[in-house]
Amino acid sequence: DAVLDLVMSKEDTSLRCACETLVTTNRVVLAGEYKGILHNQEVDSAVRKVIKDIGYEQDGFHWNNVEITNLLHGQSADIALGTDTFGAGDQGLMFGYATKETDNYMPSAIYWSHRIVEELTKVRKQGSTVLGPDAKSQVTFEYNDNSKPVRIAKVVCSTQHNKDADIEFVREFVERIIREVLPAHYVDSATEFHINPTGRFVVGGPDGDCGLTGRKIIVDTYGGSSPHGGGAFSGKDPTKVDRSAAYLTRWIAKNIVASGRADWATVQISYAIGMKDPMSFYIESNGDSRQLTKTVENLVDMTPKGIIDRFELFRPIYSSTTNYGHFGKDYLPWEKIDLF
C-alpha cells in the first residue's frame, strides 16, 4: 500500500496499480503492474521507510540493508480496455458487515483483538525494550441466546520479545497490558490467557515467517463474523472492486445499523470484469432485508466510478489501512454515517 500511495499521490484517475509484496529474511520482492511513473529510488525509499516505521532493526531483517527486488511493470493493455472506462477491474464477489456490538459497528472479537495489538505497539514505541514489532492476538467471546456478547472466554496473544527477557516475565507483562485494554465486565476468573503459547519468540517478522500480500484477509476485515469473497485489498488501486466494493458494502452495512434499521447487516455485491453495473446485490439482516435492498439500490451508485467518486479514492490514503484492519476507523471515508 505504500507503493500504491506513491501512485495515488498524483491524484490522477488514469493511474493504476496492482502491487504484490513478498517479504522474507533480508529480502523484499515487489511484483505486479502499474500505469504511471514510478521511479525505482522512490519505491526503494518507500519500502525502507515502512520497515523502519514498523521497527524492524534485527539481524535478519533491517530497513537499512534489506535487499529489495523490484519486478513491477506496465499494466496489461487488455485489462486497461475495461478499466480505462471505469468498468470493474475483475470479476468477483465482495461482502460488507456491521453490528451494533461495538461503538464503531465492528464485531467484538476482531475489535478487541485490534485494540490489544494496538496497545502493544504503543507500549513498545513509548520506549519498552521488552517487546518486538511482530505480534498478533485472538479473542474468543461467548454469546447469550439473544446473540449478545457476554464474556471473553479466551485470549491468545503472541508477541516477539527481547532475547534476554524471561518468558514468564514477558507473559506477565503482556497479560497486564491486555487486562488494561479489555472491559472488566467481559473478563472473569475463568477467562483464559494464552500468551506466547510456544514459549520463546525472539526471531520474528519476515525473518521468522515469510509474508505475502493477501495472506491475512480475515484479520483485515471482520475476524470471521462475515463471509468473505476471497479478494485481498492491499496494493490494489480503487478500480479493483475487490477493494473498492468491499469498502462500499461496509459503508452500506454500517449505515443500516447506525440508522437503527437493523442490529446487524451483511451486504453482498458482485461484478464482471469490464462491466460497470453489479451482477448481483443483496442485504441480509435482522431488519427488513428485502426493503433495505430495494432502498439502497435506488439510493447508491454502485458502479466502480460511483464508488470512487463517493469516497474520493484516488488519494494516497491506503497506508493507513495496513494495520488494525481496513474497517472501524472513523477517519476513513467508507466509515462515514451519511447514507440515510
Regions found by a protein language model. Give the residues of each.
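N-terminal, positively charged regions that mediate nucleic acid binding
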Residues: 1-16, 23
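Internal helix-turn-beta structural module
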Residues: 262-264, 268-340
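Secondary-structure transition/capping motifs at alpha-helix termini
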Residues: 9-11, 257-263
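Short amphipathic alpha-helical face segments that pack within enzyme cores
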Residues: 2, 111, 115, 244-251
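Short glycine-rich or small-residue beta-strand-to-loop segments that form or flank ligand, phosphate
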Residues: 27-35, 94, 98, 156-160, ...
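Glycine-rich anion/phosphate-binding loop at the beta-strand->alpha-helix junction
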Residues: 164-257
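Short, charge-patterned binding micro-sites
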Residues: 16-37, 273-277
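Glycine-rich, mobile lid/loop segments that gate access to catalytic sites or pores
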Residues: 17, 25-27, 45, 49-202, ...
